[in-house]
């Protein structure tokens, strides 16, 4: 048997790599008669043979489209994956957040190796691996009135994958002023909703649906309300489907009817579509006499924070609040039995992680007691108006509400709220407790 030297093997390996490179270059070359590379024809073939896509004509619409995605989170990740896979020519990603370990159960573009990386950069790397034919641009900024127009002007369509009313109103307003169609969705828990706004600049816009924003205290985030990964992922995937339908011209001005699609994953999966009203003549953005113009937005005259409001969590005085450090040194380490600790998180939160000496009374139940000390004693037998009570929640917000209730309605004199809540305590004083 003839032995092959290391030099020959190395040369053969080099020739293999050069051959693969040349083959790739050949596949990527366009014929003068072909609008795409041979590799692209093969990649998108299964998609092009679906009758509704109009074959090569539809694929070229995707290739020539520029789509901006606001948010690379639970909605944006699946939408980005499927839009990139479908062959959108240019995709822009706006997100100034970084990948956190708590994102990974639902934000499927990211992985453990990307924790700490900007989400838009993590998404760009993943998309480049999935489809090198897509041009990806990233914007690691917080979208606001000062940069929105500059970013939006480079694109044809916008996907609103954000989770705050402030951003939703801004995205819709800017899109109306630029004549852009918006595919908008939101999701929380096991539910989500989706709609198309300002279709072909004929409306309706977000303000037509919601002329008045919801009360700030009624809006929860994924961080507060939780989210089921596959449920939010399904809504994000539907966003990609609706985007393709818009680009393929499945929707026309003649057949498009404004709608709101609502999905629920639990206990039984349901998907319902509701007919929505069209453009409103009195709408301040897309109506007959618009007040929300580009000039008004860019100058800061349209105050989105003032319009949408913000939660007021400054319910307690400085004297009614203590730091996690003081709670540890002056209460836990010294006299744990000399105080009552009430944890006002929901029970399923409490069951995940809690102090052993804590008594769990969710803030909703505390409100329902209507200031009755006798009812409170059913859960805390040794409580009195002279008790020393410490109140704890997840982040130090609901605990302020509970502190006010205990002092103002139950007339307990010595009540203190732990600033930053249970998670602040874990971060600063004791890492052994699970943080969810």
From Swiss-Prot:
Main localization category: cytoplasm
Xref: PROSITE patterns: RHODANESE_3 (PS50206)
Gene Ontology BP terms: cell budding; cellular response to oxidative stress; invasive growth in response to glucose limitation; protein urmylation; regulation of pseudohyphal growth; tRNA wobble position uridine thiolation
Gene3D superfamilies: NAD(P)-binding Rossmann-like Domain, Rhodanese-like domain
Pathway(s) this gene product operates in, as recorded in its UniProt entry: tRNA modification; 5-methoxycarbonylmethyl-2-thiouridine-tRNA biosynthesis
Group of enzyme by EC: transferase
Domain of life: Eukaryota
A cellular-component GO term for this protein: cytosol
Cofactor annotation remark: Binds 1 zinc ion per subunit.
Binding site for Zn(2+): 205, 208, 283, 286
Binding, ATP: 74, 95, 102-106, 119, 163-164
Functional note: Plays a central role in 2-thiolation of mcm(5)S(2)U at tRNA wobble positions of cytosolic tRNA(Lys), tRNA(Glu) and tRNA(Gln). Acts by mediating the C-terminal thiocarboxylation of sulfur carrier URM1. Its N-terminus first activates URM1 as acyl-adenylate (-COAMP), then the persulfide sulfur on the catalytic cysteine is transferred to URM1 to form thiocarboxylation (-COSH) of its C-terminus. The reaction probably involves hydrogen sulfide that is generated from the persulfide intermediate and that acts as a nucleophile towards URM1. Subsequently, a transient disulfide bond is formed.
Database matches in PANTHER family: ADENYLYLTRANSFERASE AND SULFURTRANSFERASE MOCS3, UBIQUITIN-ACTIVATING ENZYME E1
Record-linked HAMAP family: MOCS3_Uba4
UniProt protein name: Adenylyltransferase and sulfurtransferase UBA4
């Amino acid at each position: 048997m003839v032995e092959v030297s290391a030099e020959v093997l190395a040369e053969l390996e080099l020739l293999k790599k050069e051959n693969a490179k040349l083959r790739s270059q050949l596949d990527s070359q366009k014929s003068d008669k072909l609008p795409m590379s041979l590799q692209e024809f093969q990649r998108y073939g299964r998609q092009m043979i679906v009758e509704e896509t109009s074959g090569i004509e539809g694929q070229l619409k995707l290739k020539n489209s520029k789509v901006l995605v606001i948010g690379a989170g639970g909605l944006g990740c699946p939408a980005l994956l499927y839009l990139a896979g479908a062959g959108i020519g240019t995709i822009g990603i706006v997100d100034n957040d970084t990948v956190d370990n708590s994102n990974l159960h639902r934000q499927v573009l990211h992985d453990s190796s990307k924790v700490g990386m900007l989400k838009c950069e993590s998404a760009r790397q993943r998309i480049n691996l999935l489809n090198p034919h897509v041009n990806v641009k990233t914007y690691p900024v917080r979208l606001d009135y000062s940069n929105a127009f500059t970013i939006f002007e480079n694109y044809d369509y916008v996907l609103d994958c954000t989770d705050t009313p402030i951003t939703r109103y801004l995205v819709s307003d800017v899109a109306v002023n630029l004549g852009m169609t918006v595919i908008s969705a939101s999701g929380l828990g096991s539910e989500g909703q989706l709609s198309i706004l300002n279709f072909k600049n004929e409306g309706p816009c977000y303000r037509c649906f919601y002329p008045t924003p919801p009360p700030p205290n009624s809006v929860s985030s994924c961080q507060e309300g939780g989210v089921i990964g596959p449920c939010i992922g399904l809504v994000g995937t539907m966003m990609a489907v609706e985007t393709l339908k818009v680009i393929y011209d499945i929707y026309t001005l003649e057949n498009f009817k404004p709608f709101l699609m609502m999905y629920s994953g639990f206990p039984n999966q349901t998907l319902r579509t509701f007919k929505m009203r069209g453009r409103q003549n009195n709408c301040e953005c897309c109506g007959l006499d618009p007040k929300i113009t580009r000039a008004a937005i860019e100058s800061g005259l349209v105050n989105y924070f003032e319009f949408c409001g913000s939660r007021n969590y400054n319910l307690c005085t400085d004297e009614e609040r203590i730091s996690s450090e003081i709670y540890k040194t002056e209460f836990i380490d010294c006299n744990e039995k000399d105080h009552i600790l009430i944890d006002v998180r929901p029970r399923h939160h409490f069951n995940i992680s809690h102090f052993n000496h804590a008594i769990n009374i969710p803030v909703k139940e505390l409100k329902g007691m209507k200031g009755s000390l006798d009812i409170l004693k059913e859960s805390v037998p040794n409580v009195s108006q002279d008790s020393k009570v410490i109140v704890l929640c997840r982040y130090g917000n609901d605990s302020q509400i509970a502190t006010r209730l205990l002092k103002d309605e139950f007339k307990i004199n010595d009540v203190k709220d732990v600033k930053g809540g249970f998670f602040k305590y874990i971060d600063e004083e004791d890492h052994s407790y699970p943080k969810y």
